[in-house]
Amino acid sequence: TPLYSSAASDVYKRQVFIGTSYYFYTVLSKQNIKKSTANGGVVSEDEGRLQLRYYWFNYSKSGVFDCHVNNEIKNKHFKYTFTGRNLGESRTKLGANNLYTGKFKFPVQDDNNEVAISVSSNVPQPLNIISGGWEGLYIRRNSAV
């Protein structure tokens, strides 16, 4: 069936978002420290405790998205929303549908074995996460002799 749309005003030479709104949700894999082996391979360093402090996502021309930090063992659930608005920017106007490029950093403050980090969005604006990373504290419990 054909899709028809109309606009309440003239949209000539204006940016317009057209598309279907859908729910995006993904859970990231467990974060580990990687170490190179003598034969050129890579293994996870899991002999200690990795305390994740912060996580961040680099985004490009992106709209609103949510970052979830969930720990089912401790029953802790936090949601951090990137609103697409940065205070102090001159482009931040009410009613404007701007896209932003930058870095969104949020706290985790949990053990890497217990926490699950996920990203979700259900807005019609584009979601374009190009990379991510984390800061943490690693304490090795034992060492080879």
Model-derived regions, located:
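Beta-sandwich interaction modules
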Residues: S9-D10, N86-N128, G132-E135
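Single conserved hydrophobic/aromatic residue that forms the stacking wall/gate
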Residues: T1-A8, Y12
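A general structural motif
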Residues: K13-Q15, L52, E114
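Hydrophobic, well-ordered secondary-structure elements that form the walls
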Residues: I18, Y55, I117
